[in-house]
Structure formats: C-alpha cells, structure tokens
Amino acid sequence: MDFFGRHFDDILFHLQKMREKGKISDTIHRRGLGWPLADKGDLVMGVDTAVELGHPKEGSTAFLIWTREPMRLRNKRISVLGPDLHKLVGKRIPFGKIILLGVDGFNENNSYKRYRQLENVRYDIRLKGYMMRGVSQYGREWSRVSRSAIDDGFSFPILGGALVDRYLEFKFVKTVEVVFFTSGRRDMKPFLPIAENALKIIGAMNKMIEEVSYDCDTCEYSDICGEVEDLRALRRSLQKRGKTTDA
C-alpha cells in the first residue's frame, strides 16, 4: 500500500529547490563510522548539553513516510538543511527530521504493523552523547547532544547514518533517506502541511486498527480517508477480516 505518493512528490520537489539554492548539505552514509553506543542508563543532563534540538518552546516536526518505489530515493543519503551540530553549540533550536523509506511488499494486512516497527526505531538509537528527551504522536521530537560528543566530532551524518543502518536491517526496507532541518522555521514551513497531512493518515490507520473503529460519520479522519484510496482499502480489508472472525 502506498499512502504517501503525493507527499513524496511534494517533499522531493521542495528539497530539490533548496538544493538548487545551495541550502542543503548532502552526504552518502558508509557503514563503519564507529561511534560508540551509550551505556544503559546514560543521560545527557542539562549542564552537560551542548545543543538542544526541538525543545517544546522552540518547536519540532518529525515524521516518517514510505513509498513502494524505492528507486525514487538516493539510498543512504543524509541531508542537512542548516548548520551541523558543531555550529550550534550553546543553542536551543527549532528542529525537523524526515525519514523517507523505499519499501517492498506492503499490503493491507501488514502496513500498520510494519509502520509500528519502523516508528519504534527512533527509540532504539542509543549513541553516546545523544539522548532522546521526548517524543509525541503529534510529530514532535526533542533531543539533546552533549558537549563531549560535539568535542569528539558527533554530527548529523553520524546520527543519520545510525538511523540508515537500523532501517536497512528490515528486509522490506530497500532504500533510506534522512533529512534534518536546523536553519529555522522559515525553511521548515513548506514541509509543515505535508507533515500534518501525513500524520493524519497515520492517525486514521491507528484509529482503525487500535480502536477497531469504522464509523465514518463520527470519525475525525473521514476527510483524509476520502482523499486516500489506500486508507479506504485498508478499512474494507479490516471490516472483511472482522466479519470473518465473527462468523
């Protein structure tokens, strides 16, 4: 199932425009960067923090989408729109992160389960000097980077590379791109409506599966289901499976 075709079109269009303006720094990840893992219980305390990304007072946007056309992506590309971490020391900044995945074999029976597996990856990234401070279902992500990590050369290519490696451990993921935004709200602005719409699709999937709710008349996601055929196909499949189970 391909819920996000239009979202990919829009994201790739805006990224290309920004590349043409020289606003984006791209690197291709190579395995074996060798950044140490965090020990269990490691924390980045406020006094040790060099950079705070996406503090609630500054705002953040983080989301993940996929396409059934893996070749649309440049595999293992990590893009940074704005300064890298060593240029942000002492700051608390608005932050954006987009994960773009090229996948294989998604259908109405497995799409949501696979999405949950992919979504959980951000909780699995445990790198020394990097700490996820908070996340939410509304596309927010707040993290900290320590002074010692910055001194040792921690960067977005290292963080992005860890994400790339982890996603590619799933056999159904064929290509990955990671995009980070650190230049402020103005450059993130074109992507915010895309994020909002994508998160509505995820919310609709969650309501159908976790709440087992198919009442379109009372559902707050009825408008988005009207726009996305694959959501309607998922709904029909779930209803059919429910009737089979009840029989």
Locations of regions flagged by a protein language model:
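Charged, amphipathic alpha-helical stretches
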Residues: 1-67
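Surface-exposed polar/charged interaction patches
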Residues: 18-21, 91, 138, 170, ...
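N-terminal accessory interaction module
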Residues: 51-149
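Extended, amphipathic alpha-helical scaffolds
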Residues: 56-58, 70, 213, 218-220, ...
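Intrinsically disordered, low-complexity segments enriched in charged and polar residues
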Residues: 130, 136-139, 143-161, 217, ...
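A broadly conserved sequence feature marking short terminus-proximal activation segments
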Residues: 143-207, 217
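Cysteine-cluster motifs in flexible loop/terminal segments that predominantly coordinate metals
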Residues: 195-236
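Short microdomains enriched in Cys/His and/or Lys/Arg
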Residues: 231-247
